[in-house]
Amino acid sequence: MISFITSAMQESPLFDKSYSMDADLSNAVAWNVARPDEKLKAEQEHIMHWIEERVAACKLQRHDVEWFRNCCPIVQKVSEGVCGPVLQELCDMIGHNDRAAPDLFRYGGPLIGKLPCTGNGKEHIFPAPTDVCDMWNSRATDNAALHNKLKEDKHSKFLMDQCKADAMLCRMSEPHLLEPDDVSGTRISPGFCVEQGLKEDGSLKLRAIYDLSRSGVNACTEAVEKLSYDSIDALFAVSRSFMQQGRPIAFLKADIDAAYRRVPIDPRHRWAAGVMFKYNGATQSSCHYSFPFGAKQLSMRGTELVHCLQTLRAKSFTCRCCASWMISSRRHQRNAQSMP
């Protein structure tokens, strides 16, 4: 298999015959090829040592108090798994002036409203979004209709069995969700679980998904561009350039673990983050403190974060995607999970 892939990268045409590497990728390839291995390795080890020391210091101090000053305590609690102060310091060190990613963990990200233009896509005119005021004013009526629907529907995907209900209820005790409670003041979206195979211990792996389209929350998001991501052609083109220069390469797919649940919701938008599902004849409800899987705004917030991480790893080669990296790099380069 390895020999087949190597041969394909050296000889086979790309899927898209018109594809050509972006200027930033071409420049990064040239920079990396010209860089002596020893110098590149020393620079990487220096920055990783700095990160490890700085993260350890932040954990001892329960994060920088000053950095979180005037921030919502719930946002700070959700953000404890991400070292926001170190992320901002790294951005300062490398001249990454976009504060969108660090600020996500400081103030929370919007769940509704107009999306900013990232430049990572083509301008597009979408249908007009639903008025947020209408969603707010109709929440009680629509919530009651959803509640009745869940009570009457005996074959809905929102009807949980024991295993799935236990998983959902367990998640409600974690920092990213309010414990089961009265959520009458929120806009409720129905929740369900999908199976994703088995965990290492043999237990069922489940992903909780919330239908924010059914509740109308996603309709309050106004997009201004169609996002585009690097294709497999980009990965092949970069890898081929490496190989043509006689550089050994390695591949790593690095997932950001529980990426969505690490991004807190802007406190002003929590009213739109209510969730509900049915179990054993009764409904269970809660409210999200972090982004639920199913929120339209997630694609943008994930893109902001990945763009920041890409800049931090500018001398590796990454293909953009929402919650994962595909990296083609020299074998001695440190793995992405070393990032804070």
Which residues does each PLM region occupy?
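Non-catalytic, polymerase-adjacent accessory regions of viral genome-replication enzymes
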Residues: 1-151
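Reverse-transcriptase-like RNA-dependent polymerase core
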Residues: 88-139, 193-207, 258-286, 301-311
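Helix-boundary capping/turn motifs
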Residues: 137-138, 166, 320
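Glycine-rich, often proline-containing surface loops adjacent to acidic residues and nearby aromatics
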Residues: 142, 282-287, 322-329
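Active-site palm subdomain of RNA-directed nucleic acid polymerases
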Residues: 299-340
